[in-house]
């Protein structure tokens, strides 16, 4: 079954421009992490455009979602529990008794209520030693189920910058490291969670996990992602398990991004110490679609850089370089899964597509019609063709610039293919909150 897309409506207007800018920024940040050849310096991605030609979509199968899509991480566990699992707590007093409704602006109402609950008519007094200390805000009862978890600050997501988009990708869950222990582990009784010191002996202490649900010390560190948005548990180059770069990026519950979760892994930590994978409950309304995606359009991407000349001395002068990707040809199987207000998206490699859908997927004629086990098929990339134009130097005083520099073009195309396959091809996937 084919699907028609209103491409102009989806890619134009303020929303389309914002999405294009986020994609440009994502690709730019990825290029900043690349080790450049000695003769290239300062790569900048200056523009991105969706073009005017839409992709062709054809639904091939409908099935249950991949198990990786059900895996939770500690960052999204808090929001999940606040949305669906945590019932609203009844207000309680400091002794754990249920508090009846009372008017806060009525003089003496709280004191009268407490006297009635405790069964005496004398004036209400605090226990000895607490008259002047008061109740610590961190120890007072807090209904975290009513707090929007996205109001807490988060670190910048290594894809779409700013942390405000509706895109996210995830990194694979791995081991724990020192103080960067995930919140879920602390709540289960980690030996590192000593709790708050009890300055009031009569009051039971609360652990850090109860009062700092999203602090910098309780969340897994994302510093090693290069501080760059959109995951999947983006398993771009790590353990082939769900992450998630979905973890593009705070706002409302709709259109919210989940940050990537990639805790640092200790090389000497035994595998038995790794936390077990926590899976969401499968529901009957969850579904997954395999969709063949073919594209031969005029999508464009512009980059600038400098080429260094070593004559008469190393890095003697830099020449401006401009690269324009003017279109590409693409043929792959997309996976779209819907699981409780989350849409997970990725592409399948040619080998996985052959195994799940059949060898006819991705065969567009010519060399692509080889048998699945043919050695010539293995290196096949999802990006079949990328058209690029390059220009070195500036046209000044009638002088012509040097165009179509093959060595530089080859390097840029290799990096574009690598970024695409690491960030978009399963087991990497992106998560959208809807």
From Swiss-Prot:
CDD domains: SMP_Mdm12 (cd21672). Component of the ERMES/MDM complex, which serves as a molecular tether to connect the endoplasmic reticulum (ER) and mitochondria. Components of this complex are involved in the control of mitochondrial shape and protein biogenesis, and function in nonvesicular lipid trafficking between the ER and mitochondria. MDM12 is required for the interaction of the ER-resident membrane protein MMM1 and the outer mitochondrial membrane-resident beta-barrel protein MDM10. Belongs to the MDM12 family. It comes from the Eukaryota. Residues 215-237 have a biased composition (Polar residues). InterPro entries: Mdm12, MMM1_dom, SMP_LBD. One of its GO terms (molecular function) is lipid binding. Its main location: mitochondrion. The SMP-LTD domain is a barrel-like domain that can bind various types of glycerophospholipids in its interior and mediate their transfer between two adjacent bilayers. Component of the ER-mitochondria encounter structure (ERMES) or MDM complex, composed of MMM1, MDM10, MDM12 and MDM34. A MMM1 homodimer associates with one molecule of MDM12 on each side in a pairwise head-to-tail manner, and the SMP-LTD domains of MMM1 and MDM12 generate a continuous hydrophobic tunnel for phospholipid trafficking. Keywords: Endoplasmic reticulum, Lipid transport, Lipid-binding, Membrane, Mitochondrion, Mitochondrion outer membrane, Transport. Residues 70-141, 181-275 are annotated as: Disordered. This is Mitochondrial distribution and morphology protein 12. Residues 70-83 have a biased composition (Acidic residues). GO terms for biological process: mitochondrial genome maintenance; mitochondrion-endoplasmic reticulum membrane tethering; phospholipid transport; protein insertion into mitochondrial outer membrane. Residues 1-434 form the SMP-LTD domain. It is found in: Mitochondrion outer membrane; Endoplasmic reticulum membrane. Transmembrane segments: none annotated. The keyword Membrane applies. The keyword Endoplasmic reticulum applies. GO terms for cellular component: endoplasmic reticulum membrane; ERMES complex. It holds the Pfam family MMM1. Residues 86-97 have a biased composition (Basic and acidic residues). It is a peripheral membrane protein.
